[in-house]
Amino acid sequence: LKKTPAVDIALHDPVDADAAHTSSESTSLKNEEIVGFDHIVPELRKKLTKGSQQLDVISIVGMGGQGKATLANKLFNDDSVKSRFDIRAQCCVSQEYSCRSILLAILRDLSCDDPAASELSTEDLRDKLQKMWKVKRYLILIDDIWEASVWEDLQPCFADVNNGSRIILTTRQVEVANSARISCEPFHLPMFKEDESWKLLKEKVFGNEGCSPDLEKVGLEIAKKCAGLPLSIVLVVGILAKGKNEQCWRQVAKNLGSHIQSDAEAMIEN
């Protein structure tokens, strides 16, 4: 797996952490925009737009809350990437997998919700897509594949007509990425280091303001408990920004445990 340092990833619009555990807030956290990846995007963009004319799969591997889907969508919507492909579509697999549902989602994304598509069988959907692949250079984003068997089931649906088509795939499982590999090595998203987590927390809480040494000491402890996950950092930014005092921060540090990571992952899964 290819690895790269985690640097300069910034979060926009920190959420109100007081309501972070409601379903509506969970949705907003799940969709929280994480921007940056400035050192990563150019390399992956090149894999999408340059190189062999053979169909290739660019797999992005990482834990829940690490920013896989955000990076994939950033690439998918990149102007230079969009201009390279004739047609584009995206879908999310999730744990309840259905080949027909995935193919239907892709076709609907390509055909502007053609109502007739819902009546097609799996075989008809596959055939309809195969006809598109033969005349169009395509880019497909498949988010959140959990098992290699799912990719093995989907793979025959994507024709290689040697026209530079690409598939972006996100997964938590190295096995899935290895199974999907054609030419490009799977890309392994790095975890934040503690100092990077603190840098991000400090930036989002204080902006251009300074941070006292006492708060920095507690802040480093909080950053450590975020376990290197951007989404975990989002969960605490709102609280820290509301109470910029040592007492409040120590209370957060005291109550913040390993559950923060499972909370972040649960929001990704729901």
Regions found by a protein language model. Give the residues of each.
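Intracellular innate-immunity NLR/STAND receptor architecture
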Residues: 1-270
